[in-house]
Amino acid sequence: MSAIYNLEPQPTASVIIHTTRGELSVELFAKQAPLTCRNFLQLALDGYYDNTIFHRLVPGFILQGGDPTGTGNGGESIYDGGAFSGDLDPWPMDQRMGKNAGPTGINFKDEFHSRLKFNRRGLLGSANESRPDTNSSQFFFTLDTAEELNGKNTMFGRIAGDTVYNLAKMGEGEVDEATERPTYPVKIERIEILINPFEDMKKRSRVAAVAPSKTTTTKDKKKKRKGGKQLLSFGDDEGDDEMPVLKKKKFDPRIVMEAPEEAPEQDEVRSKPTKAKKERASEKRVSIAQEEQDNSDQTTPREPPKEVRQKPAPPVKMEIEDESPEPEAPRKTALERANEEMAALKASMRRTIHSEEPVKEKKKSALESMIPETSMRGRKRRPGAANTSAADDAKALRMLKAFQSRLEKAPPEKENEPAARETTKDGEDAQAGDEEAELCDLHFIANCQSCTSWDKQEKDESDDEGWMSHALSFAADKLGKDLSNRRKAEEELVVIDPREKARTLKDEKKAARDARQGNSGRAWDQARDAARNAKMAQAASLAGRGAK
C-alpha cells in the first residue's frame, strides 16, 4: 500500500462528503486533472450535489452519483452553461470549440495521467456516456480494482483515512440487479470544501431572467382597471363588469353567508371579461373609449335583472341563518377536515369500536396500566367445559387408577426355560431325540431356528404380561466406593520411572561386559550388594549415635 501512495502524486485539494451513512473524506488531484476538479469543486460550492442520491450501485465494482434527477440521465458541467449559469444562455454550437469543450460541443474532455490508475477501492472517477470527452457532473467511487476503466474514465481523487469503511458499507447495500438501482439509496446531504486550490472560484446562484414584455402587459391591464373606476355607480343603467364582485365584498361575512345558488352568477360575471377580451382582440383599430361604450351597451340589458336578483337575496339569507344561527361546517379549515377524516379512518380500522358514541373510560388498575395498548386479550374458557384443566386432571386420575389395578391383577413373571436341551450320556437317547424333532426341508436340521415362523414367536412373547410384575434389580457398583477395591486398583497400576529404567539398562550392559571379560555376573552382584550393605550399616551407626 505504501508503494501505491509513493507512485501517486500529492493531492492538492480536499473535501468532505456528508452522507446519510457517514462521512467520506476525499482528496483531489487538482494539478493533474484541473478541468475535472474545477467542475467538481464549483458544483459542490454552488450546492449542486446537495440532497442528491447515489443512483447506481454495482457490488464489487462502483458506486455512482452526482445526478440531481436521480435517474442517471441528468447532470451538466460548469463549462456548458448549465443550471447555475445565471443570466447566460447555453453556448451556441458554433462557439463550443474551445479547449474545454469536447468534440461534440458539450461537457468537457477527459484527463488521463500515467500515475493515476484504478488499481484499488476508494478511488474517485468522472462518469461519462461511454464515449470519450463526455464528462458532466456525475462521478463514481470504485469498490474494488477496476483496471478496465483505465484510459476510459478520468480519475481525479481518492478517499483518505478510515472513511473508506463507510464506502464499503454503502457498497454492501441491497440492489435491484435488473436496474442496478439501490433499494435504499444513500443521500448526499452536503459537501464541505476544506482546501480549494482555485482562488478565483466563487459561489454562484441561479438567477431567473425576467422578461420585460410580461411586465408591460401587466401594467397595461392595471391601467385599464384603474380607468374603469370612473364608471362605478349604483345606477341600474350603467356599470362595470366587476361591479357585482366589488359589491359583494362589502357584505359582512359574519352576517351574510354565500349561498350555493350564486355560484352560476359568479361564473357568468367572471366569463364576461373573457368575452370582452375576445371582442377587443377582434376590433384592434377601434379606440378604447368606443370599446368601453360597446361593452357597456352589451352589458346593460343583462345587468338590471342580475342586480334585481341580488337585492332581495340578503333577507332570504337572513331567514336561513335564523334557523341555524351557528353554522359549524363552513368555518372548518382544510386541516381540520383532514384531521377529522384521519380520525374516522383510524376508528373504522379498530376492532373494538362498533359505534360512534363516546365510551367512558374506566379507571385502570396498576396491573392493567402495565399492559401495552397494542396487546390483544385472549378468550376466556367457559367453566365446566370439556377442555378445562379440571376435566383433564380427572381424566388423568381415572387412567392412573385403571393402570394400577391392572398391575395388581397381573400374573407373576414366567421363569426362563433353558434354551439348550439336556443330552443324555448315551448316544442312543440323543439320536432318538433328534429323530423325534422335526427336520426342516431346506437345511435338514432339527429344530432349525431359521425356518421357524418368527412372527408367531414374537406374538407369543408379546402376549406375556409378566413384565408388569417384574422387578428391576442391578448389581452393586462398588468401583471407586469400596476402599479395598480402590487399593487393589492402585496396586495394579504400574509406575515406571524412565530414569530408573535407564539406570537398570546401564547396569545390565555393564554386567554383560564384565561377564565377557571373565568376571561373572554373580560376583558383580555380590560386590554391589556388599557396597550397599556397607552404606546402610554406616547410616545405621550414625542414627544410633544420634539416638543416644
Swiss-Prot record:
GO cellular component terms given for this protein? catalytic step 2 spliceosome; cytoplasm
Keyword Kinase in record: no
Catalyses which reaction?
[protein]-peptidylproline (omega=180) = [protein]-peptidylproline (omega=0)
Q: Which terms does the UniProt entry file under GO BP?
A: mRNA processing; protein folding; RNA splicing
Q: Which UniProt keywords apply?
A: Cytoplasm, Isomerase, mRNA processing, mRNA splicing, Nucleus, Rotamase, Spliceosome
Residue ranges of the region described as Disordered: 204-436, 504-548
Q: Which domain of life is it from?
A: Eukaryota
Stored Pfam families: Pro_isomerase
The family annotation for this protein states:
Belongs to the cyclophilin-type PPIase family. CWC27 subfamily.
Protein task: PPIases accelerate the folding of proteins. It catalyzes the cis-trans isomerization of proline imidic peptide bonds in oligopeptides. Involved in pre-mRNA splicing.
What name goes with this protein? Peptidyl-prolyl isomerase CWC27
Organism, by scientific name, is Gibberella zeae (strain ATCC MYA-4620 / CBS 123657 / FGSC 9075 / NRRL 31084 / PH-1) (Wheat head blight fungus)
Primary gene name = CWC27
